[in-house]
């Protein structure tokens, strides 16, 4: 099969200048030409003229031949339905139908299963919806409950009869007298006590005021507090000043808010832990039928006795009036004093003794036990 040949035609118009128009021509295998042209022009009155020659074929054969399209149209808008003029009237109906279809799609199918949710209920009722957490005011006056903070202590003398009230009245009368107020005849003959006389220097001395006399105690005891409210705080874990505990010195001094204590102690949790461990050991030994408390005590006492020396480190003889130094070394009293006159340090560890020799009660106790055993043996 021979390939198709495309030719060009010239379209001429009677009323307009000559223009070029695209006309599809195909040539069949036997040489006959096929012409497909657009019979309409832009002006409407144009005539199409065929200016090419297509061989020896007649025009009747050309009209009877089937037109073949060479260029393939794009298929992008193949599935798009073009809107016709008659569809304008049915626009409103189509919109209503589409909305009905959408509403029908959104309707959920009934489900018999139970579902639980923490969100608000979607059921609509006649009552208006309220938020989940809503608190209404009771619209009442707040109950006055001060827990006894305004209670008054009535065990003391009444404030209008105590020493301070008497002194205030005396100073008030003296103030009136200094201002030149006239006195009654009955007032001059009435004795008002040693503090009732007119003080002509009251305006020049500061001590004639209650604020300055309170500390001096010139008008009796101070008033007790009428309103008492005690708050106690138990600090089971006091904050220790680290600087003072390690060095014995704190730059803040007495104003330091932490406790100044250099003692070593165990916190509560550590004490409880040790007690629980000891209880576990005791219960285990009790279940096994073993009593280790007495045995351990005997072992500890034996170890302590074995740790004590049996003779003086200097004279290598049994102790005579044994003494012990700060470094826990035992000597005879005579040997220790004699060595101290020559050397101020310990004979064993060469540490300063500071001249301190305490009585060795452990050695004396052991010597007494040995003496009693020897007497019983005799």
Swiss-Prot record:
One of its GO terms (molecular function) is zinc ion binding. Residues 56-68, 114-125, 140-150 have a biased composition (Polar residues). Transmembrane segments: none annotated. CDD domains: RING-HC_RNF113A_B. Residues 29-46 have a biased composition (Low complexity). A zinc finger (C3H1-type) spans 235-263. InterPro entries: CWC24-like, Znf_CCCH, Znf_CCCH_sf, Znf_RING, Znf_RING/FYVE/PHD, Znf_RING_CS. SUPFAM superfamilies: CCCH zinc finger, RING/U-box. Residues 73-82 have a biased composition (Basic residues). It comes from the Eukaryota. A zinc finger (RING-type) spans 312-350. Residues 14-150, 283-303 are annotated as: Disordered. Keywords: DNA-binding, Metal-binding, Zinc, Zinc-finger. Disulfide bonds: none annotated. Residues 290-303 have a biased composition (Acidic residues). This is Zinc finger CCCH domain-containing protein 51. The lineage of its organism: Eukaryota, Viridiplantae, Streptophyta, Embryophyta, Tracheophyta.
